[in-house]
Regions:
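Non-cysteine beta-strand/loop elements that form the S-adenosyl-L-methionine
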Residues: 1, 64-69, 102-110, 185-193
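Histidine/acidic residue-rich metal-binding segments in metalloenzymes
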Residues: 88-109, 113-187, 208-229
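Metal-associated gating/positioning segment near the N- to mid-region
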Residues: 1-54
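Glycine-rich, aromatic-flanked loop segments that form ligand/cofactor-binding clefts
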Residues: 44-72, 188
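His/Asp/Glu-enriched, well-ordered alpha-helical/loop segment
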Residues: 140, 203, 212-274
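N-terminal small/glycine-rich loop or linker at the start of catalytic domains
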Residues: 1-10, 61-80, 131-132
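Active-site environment of divalent metal-dependent phosphoester hydrolases
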Residues: 2-4, 45-49, 71-72, 111-115, ...
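Active-site mouth loops of central-metabolism enzymes
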Residues: 8-23, 75-92, 144-146
Length: 274
């Protein structure tokens, strides 16, 4: 909710003096007009998502938020989330999220795609044993877990640990896809964060095309396995404004005539888990 798809620094500054309720209401109204009745937020440390949750009922929307994502000190996510230095501190933060009435826990366990270089992430994922502990601790507190995760081994480790959903999931292989399917992980591939970059001139067009092709091939393979796929735009990411429906077009392109059934099944599982 905090980001706007254009300028992340400006978007964050919008709430520097407190949550801009006018902005939040404008975004909620956008989704209401589009017919959305359920939104799952990625969280932020300025309480923008929390404010959105408190207002969403006025717009006929069920709104779920982790309040803020949790990220390891020195790794990706600190610009928007809360940082922990060790597992003990993370566990205390998870307990605090329970006291603050978070709906679920979001963990940041990998870097981003480098959109100028196919196959490259901005940093490696966290160690598998750390990923397992992060998910276990949150589950023990009764939370579902959303994971920002890219890279085959990172996603495989998260799925094997029982993560409830994976957001993004770039550069997966058969083992990672199979792990998600076998463990009931819902994959939210956020294709629009890649596809919407085409033609903008911001990144290498050849690399963007290759990244998108790879992601779409994996979505098709996962669907063929019977895996759970849900639509989610990562709204607020660069070139993905709130209300953008390009994610649905991209998923329909991959999934064909079965798209509605596949996505409805995945979305229902998201709502059940979260």
């Amino acid at each position: 909710m905090v980001l706007d798809g254009a300028d992340w620094k400006r978007a964050i500054a919008r709430h520097s003096g407190g949550v801009d309720e006018v902005w939040v209401r404008r975004v909620l109204e956008t989704y209401r007009k589009l017919g959305f009745t359920y939104l799952r937020d990625g969280g932020d440390r300025w309480s923008v998502g929390a404010k959105a949750r408190s207002l969403a009922g006025e717009y006929g929307i069920t709104y779920r938020t982790p309040l803020s994502p949790l990220c390891a000190q020195g790794h990706y996510g600190g610009f928007i989330g809360e940082k922990y230095e060790n597992l003990s501190q993370y566990a205390a933060m998870v307990s605090q999220k329970r006291a603050e009435d978070a709906d679920f826990i979001k963990i940041m366990i990998s870097g981003l795609m480098d959109f100028d270089r196919f196959g490259v992430l901005t940093e490696d994922g966290l160690p598998p044993e750390t990923i397992r502990e992060l998910i276990h601790i949150a589950h023990e507190e009764g939370f579902a877990v959303m994971a920002h995760a890219n890279g085959a081994r990172t996603v495989e480790a998260a799925a094997q640990a029982g993560v409830d959903s994976v957001e993004h999931g770039a550069y997966l292989d058969t083992d990672a896809l199979r792990a998600m399917r076998e463990n009931g992980t819902v994959w939210v591939p956020t294709l629009s964060t890649i596809g919407n970059l085409r033609g903008t001139g911001r990144f290498d067009e050849t690399a963007v095309a290759a990244i998108l092709e790879s992601a779409m091939e994996n979505v098709a393979a996962f669907a063929a396995m019977g895996g759970l796929i849900a639509p989610g735009t990562d709204a607020g990411a660069w070139a993905v404004p709130h209300g953008s429906l390009s994610e649905y077009a991209l998923l329909e392109q991959v999934l064909g005539e079965n798209a509605e059934n596949i996505l409805s099944r995945g979305a229902a599982e998201i709502q059940r888990k979260f």
